[in-house]
């Protein structure tokens, strides 16, 4: 399994629509204003989060249960900035829509800018032939409110290509998050 370069990422985005919308270079300024970088890097792609968030509040249930998650546990927020309460989390989605090739597994890592502030980004791998907007989870590990900025870089996707194509892809098995759009809550 090998990690893919900026050249490969550009080629796959342009020819195969792997990432839409796509920035072929790193973007560090928008309208002469400094932003947290996003776009193509040497061996990855830095994604942005959209301006729709679901902020977790612990007012409706005593237990968090992935098999019976209560949607009322979230407050919907739309805006350029999302404030996450201390020791809580928020869900968001990428601006970018992904179409992962059959021979590729994509890993997401948080950006150091957020990690250095105690904000952790978590995403499970994007499996072969999965497509959709990526649901992002931001954990605020601090005892202070934390800000997340919409339309700026939040995480980096790394593309790993296998030396052998898988027998069964995410699409083949009818994965439950296939084609997701918007922030998607847990499904069982």
UniProtKB/Swiss-Prot annotation:
It comes from the Bacteria. InterPro entries: dCTP_deaminase, dUTPase-like_sf, dUTPase_trimeric. DCTP binds at residues 111-116, 135-137, 156, 170, 180. It is an enzyme of class 3 (hydrolase). Homotrimer. It catalyses: dCTP + H2O + H(+) = dUTP + NH4(+). Gene3D superfamilies: 2.70.40.10. Catalyzes the deamination of dCTP to dUTP. GO terms for molecular function: dCTP deaminase activity; nucleotide binding. Belongs to the dCTP deaminase family. The keyword Hydrolase applies. Pathway: Pyrimidine metabolism; dUMP biosynthesis; dUMP from dCTP (dUTP route): step 1/2. Keywords: Hydrolase, Nucleotide metabolism, Nucleotide-binding. GO terms for biological process: dUMP biosynthetic process; dUTP biosynthetic process; nucleobase-containing small molecule interconversion. This is dCTP deaminase. The active site is at residue 137. CDD domains: trimeric_dUTPase (cd07557). Its EC number is 3.5.4.13.
